[in-house]
Amino acid sequence: MQQHLKYKIMTNIKHLAIIMDGNARWADQHNLTKSEGHKAGADKIRELLPEFINLNIPYITLYTFSSENWQRSSTEVDFLIKLLSIYFKNELNSLHKNGVKIKVIGRLNLLSSSLQKQINNAIELTKNNNKITLCIAFSYGSRQEIVDACTKIIASGKKEISESDIGHALYDPEMPDVDLLIRPGGVYRISNFLLWQAAYAELYFSPKYWPAFNKDDIIEAINDYSKRKRTFGKR
């Protein structure tokens, strides 16, 4: 009964965003390589996605690779890009079978043509699924997204820009505002992630590294969220 109650609470959350932080530090802690840490982080998606589905969360966004991550070593960057490709290769059929709609946001033009094709194929295959939307933020930065949106609006010939114009010009105009943003890893910042969409999001930080995060940690974050009063600037 208690577990059912916890799940019922979750129906209030329409969009859960997660900064998947701490892969490398988790690897150091376990005497593993950074690559092994990132792989463990990717495996965690496979583990937790069924829980998100059971919790009836309509929209999940995962921050997997930021625009600033391009400045890391070429070895690490190449592995992270390869990991995304492997994820789609290994998981796409299962995701599709389970009703998951795939979206990918970011400056995808910086990726190889083969990976862009793989991403587009995943989006096309799953576009009519409606159980849950899994949005992967890759080569993504929120400031860059807002700049790209404004550039797009200006190119359309508009002289004045409204909030609505920007919202419709973002990478995913259908993305709902973030209700709860979770960041594991013991770091207390949002690192250029969904700044527009998370304007009124509740923030939850955990000292646990992402590869160590589990279902109970998600439930704990949800229960914490359920106790908060969201005023959206009102009284």
UniProtKB/Swiss-Prot annotation:
Mg(2+) binds at residues 21, 202. Gene3D superfamilies: Decaprenyl diphosphate synthase-like. Binds 2 magnesium ions per subunit. Pfam families: Prenyltransf (PF01255). GO terms for biological process: polyprenol biosynthetic process. Its EC number is 2.5.1.-. Its cofactor is Mg(2+). The keyword Magnesium applies. Keywords: Magnesium, Metal-binding, Transferase. Homodimer. Belongs to the UPP synthase family. This is Isoprenyl transferase.
